[in-house]
């Protein structure tokens, strides 16, 4: 029960952070970038998001379920992790290649932003949050994600000027 309470607290803190950061960033970015750049960002992000969805393709849910069932059997746990992560890497590689082909062939006017969005796709490919959720180590995932969100926010304020 103690572990469940800690995991719940970690999750609540992270969810609050997920609501606060956009609340702070949206007005700043809207004023700084303007309507055109916000629209271009939203458009290009929606494209990369489809490729991220294909990369993960239910792996988060399946991974948590499979890992939580095998977390006490080390040999089976390693095998489960390898097979799930191998599938994620395979789908991610296909997505990365397809995304860059689409970016070059069909969307060359937005190529620079689409190239930068490769970072989102790569982060989805290497993301193993499902493993840590499966072994009930919420603190690792929440701490890492919170640090990334806070650093990203600080970098946006420092680097996005005009």
PLM region spans:
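Transmembrane-helix boundary and interhelical linker motifs in polytopic inner-membrane proteins
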Residues: 2, 33-37, 51-86, 133-139
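Signature of the first transmembrane helix
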Residues: 3-60, 100, 153
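Hydrophobic transmembrane helix module of multi-pass membrane transport proteins
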Residues: 88-162
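Short amphipathic alpha-helical segments, especially helix-boundary/capping motifs
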Residues: 1-5, 24-26, 38-44, 77, ...
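Hydrophobic faces of transmembrane alpha-helices in multi-pass small-molecule transporters and flippases
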Residues: 1-24, 85, 89, 114, ...
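A general secondary-structure boundary signal
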Residues: 4, 8, 56, 80, ...
């Amino acid at each position: 029960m103690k572990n469940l309470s800690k995991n719940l607290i970690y999750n609540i803190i992270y969810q609050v952070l997920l609501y606060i950061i956009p609340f702070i960033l949206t007005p700043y970015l809207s004023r700084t970038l303007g309507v055109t750049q916000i629209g271009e960002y939203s458009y290009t992000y929606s494209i990369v998001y489809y490729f991220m969805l294909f990369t993960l393709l239910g792996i988060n849910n399946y991974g948590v379920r499979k890992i939580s069932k095998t977390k006490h059997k080390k040999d089976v746990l390693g095998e489960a992790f390898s097979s799930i992560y191998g599938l994620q890497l395979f789908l991610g590689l296909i997505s990365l290649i397809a995304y860059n082909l689409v970016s070059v062939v069909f969307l060359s006017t937005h190529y620079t932003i689409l190239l930068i969005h490769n970072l989102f796709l790569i982060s989805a490919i290497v993301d193993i949050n499902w493993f840590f959720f499966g072994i009930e180590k919420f603190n690792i995932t929440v701490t890492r994600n919170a640090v990334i969100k806070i650093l990203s926010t600080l970098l946006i304020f420092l680097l996005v000027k005009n």
